[in-house]
Amino acid sequence: MSSIIERADFDLIAGWVQPGERVLDLGCGDGSLLKRLIEERGAKGYGVELEEAGVLAAIAKDINVIQGNLEQGLAGFDDQTFNHVVLSRTLQTVRHTERILAEMLRVGREAVVSFPNFAYWKNRLAVMGGRMPVSEDLPYEWFDTPNLRFFTLLDFESLCAKMNLVIRERQVLDEAGRLVTEEPNFLGSLAVYRLGR
């Protein structure tokens, strides 16, 4: 049986999905989140993944997945097809940020986005020490990272305001996966948002 990756943001996302809802996971990797949503929530899950290894791993988990590049949009999906469109730890890797967020809310009633917070105090400390941060949420060295963008909670919320997106809920986690309520832009390592129009 294929292993399922456990992540704290998956716990939050799973809590937001109601039984039987339709979920599209963009950049689904090996399909671990979708597998969990299908098994625990009875969701109808579909994935889009660029990397062949991820597609094959998702197929091995019996996930409905297509190989595709998010940068080319979601033209293959009709408007409002899904209850939730998830972009988990992937937004920082896309070039056309505004377009993908708009597409998510075209094909889904709600967008769920998680990303590493570059303003987390340990990341700031690394940069102040003259080094790019490497952590569980930012696991790559500067020379091999797929990340194109390094942004903070405040940056993301400014973008949401510019795009007239409604932040329905925001949860921020520390490196241990615990909820952060005080000074989240400073103490939070990973942010998870529910967005609507």
What residue spans do the PLM features occupy?
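Glycine-rich SAM-binding Motif I of class I
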Residues: 31-35
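A short acidic, Gly/Pro-enriched loop at the edge of an enzyme's catalytic core
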Residues: 75-84
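Conserved alpha-helix/loop element of class I SAM-dependent methyltransferases that forms part
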Residues: 4-20
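A short SAM/SAH-binding and catalytic strip from SAM-dependent methyltransferases
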Residues: 84-95
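Class I SAM-dependent methyltransferase SAM/SAH-binding core
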Residues: 36-73
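S-adenosyl-L-methionine-dependent methyltransferase catalytic module, highlighting the catalytic core
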Residues: 98-103, 110-197
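Class I SAM-dependent methyltransferase "Motif I" SAM/SAH-binding loop
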Residues: 27-29
